[in-house]
C-alpha cells in the first residue's frame, strides 16, 4: 500500500501517499460504489499522470477515514467534501499526493519535489523584505519550505485572488 506518512490529532489529520500502484490496483482499494464512480470519472482526464493523481487522492482519503467520501470543487477550484464533514486540502508533486483534513477550520497543505528550479522562480513568491534561510545548510530546501508554507496558507485562505508575494512570512523554521 502507498501510505507513506500519516499524522493525526483530535482536530486535524494529514497523510501522504506514494503513487506506486497501477490504476487498476488503486481502484481495487476503493469500496465498490466509489470504484464504479471513479472508473467513469477517470475518462475525463487524458494524462495518465493526472489520472493517477486524481485517483490516488481518493484512495488516500479512503485510507485516512475508512469511509467513502466524495470530493467536490468550488467554482474557484477549491476542494471540499460534499457532506461537509471536514475541511480538505489536497496537494501533489511528482510521485506523491497529500491530503489534509480539519474538523473546525479551513485546511492548507502543500508538498513539493526537491528541485533546483525553485531558485529561478523565487522572485514570484518571496517579498523583498522577507529573508529566506537555508534549511539544514541547504538553500534549496529553505526556498521550498518558504514556497510550501505560502502555498499552504494560500489554500487555507478564502480569497482566491490572494497573491503569494503579498503574504509575508517571518522566521518559521
Role assignments for model-derived ranges:
Residues 1-173:
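Core catalytic alpha/beta fold that binds nucleotide/phospho-ligands
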